[in-house]
Amino acid sequence: MEMEKTMQIIHSPEALHSVCAEWRRQGLKTALVPTMGYYHAGHASLISYARSVADKVIVSLFVNPTQFGPNEDLEAYPRDFEKDSALVRELGGDVLYAPEPENMYAPDHATWVEVPALANTLCGLSRPIHFRGVCTVVLKLFMLAQPSLAVFGEKDWQQLAIIKKMVSDLNVPVEVVGRPIVREADGLAFSSRNVYLTPEERAQAPQIRKSLEMAAGLAAGGERDAARIIEAVRGYLAEHLPTGEEDY
């Protein structure tokens, strides 16, 4: 296929910037899909959407070390570059940008981008440096590629809200597009980290979505006491998700 022959794999920031600058000079619309790899149907939907709305598609594949805290899964995070690059080719990506950490962070790197008002809650409570790392690397990618739009999944809703706020506050000329969650047949959202689940945990995981649907049903039915809704959800999860532990 022609698109398989023309996809470029780029490792250096300078090369990415050069290629994207030439596309801009040609007046082409470009879309960036930032990822950490180990692709599944959710990633495929983002790349396919980008392909449908842009002249050129850049997919970044970078397991960003600065968004992992101590004792998190940086080294264990699943990776399969050959499979991932083949999928990007198949879906019509024009560039796969796969830098090494030293390409993105100098040894004396000391500058960070943060949105504390949105980051210091929910997922950020237990991962205090996570969103700082996300914002910093995403802004780096935006500056290198300078895309017309960037595509993110709605599965990581807090991340999406933070990136939109960063772009708004800093007047970054990039349209941030959120795309719907893609789920497996039983309702569990596709995630690269689902491979960590034991068979028992995997069987119970869809109950999280069911508990949220129950909460939405209570609210739609007129319940306005948040404490009662939370209590009902906790009771449901205690019964149906005994292997789980509440984070937030």
Spans of model-derived segments:
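Nucleotidyltransferase catalytic core that binds NTPs
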Residues: 2-248
